[in-house]
Amino acid sequence: MNYKTPTKAIITDAGFASRYLPITKTIPKAMLPLGNRPIMQLVVEECVDAGIEEIIIVATPEGRKIYDDYFHDECEKIEALLTKQGKVERFEPVKKVLNFPKITVIEQDQSLPYGNGSPVASAREFINDDEAFIVAYSDDVVFGASAVKDLIEAHKAHPDAMAIIAAQEMPHEEMNKYGAISLKDESAMTLKDIIEKSDDAPSDLASYGRYLLTPEVFKYLDPKNIGKDGELWTVDAITRIAETGNVYVEKTKGTWMTTGDPKNYFLSHLKYVKEFEDYYKDIKKFVAEN
């Protein structure tokens, strides 16, 4: 079966981000800022730039309220105050957020086991049986190009795909930090397996949190299929699909960085400032002088 090209994306932020405590006791990790935009907004914008029409954000019960407020509250009092002060142009970034395509925020199904596959499974009712869809982990940001757009273009080239996963080449000596891709057919770029954090990586291609999936994945995102550490893993489901169907690997054009821990969050923030803010030169000067 050939599935329809994606128009929907599931973005996940349903964990508790214990490496960021105490701040994530109150604020979802993907609401931490890069410049004046939260990480989640950058992931949403990547999807919007690729033509995605509907986004489902999967959050914790506490995070759901915060994401609903951020993407849906019209903040009329703030706009009125800025208008009165003659600073209404400062409200333009808020209007941009409010004008995004349809965004629905849901809670992760609490009956599912822990693991990054459970937020995806929680959004099953939003996905039609005949359509492919995007899954994006909000831990990951992509600079310079939309990985979501790359995946959608790859789907047009491979309508037989049961899934397509994003990949980035990394230095070989660092591959023990990532999920290393093993290819079934190098010329066709089809997946055999993903080997997590191994000192004997089968390639220098690292898998990261951008996937084009089909409803086939829900057959395997089931509590009876828990894997390492008793968790439900999206990667496990994808490799099960690869056993009988074509899962393609797409080397994306942008630069992927993770925000999954404080160190890499800081590096991602620095990359953001370098790319988007004119005060980067002041930061370079400060670092040089101190």
Task: Walk through the language-model features, giving the residues of each.
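Catalytic-core segments of class I nucleotidyltransferases/pyrophosphorylases
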Residues: 134, 148, 152, 156, ...
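Active-site metal-binding loops of divalent metal-dependent hydrolases
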Residues: 16, 140, 262
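Conserved N-terminal catalytic core of the sugar/cofactor nucleotidyltransferase
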Residues: 1-11, 19, 37-131, 143
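Conserved beta-strand termini and adjacent loop/short-helix elements that scaffold enzyme active sites
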Residues: 106-110, 122, 166, 197, ...
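Nucleotide-activated chemistry modules centered on ATP-dependent adenylation/adenylyltransferase
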Residues: 173-177, 181, 210, 214-215
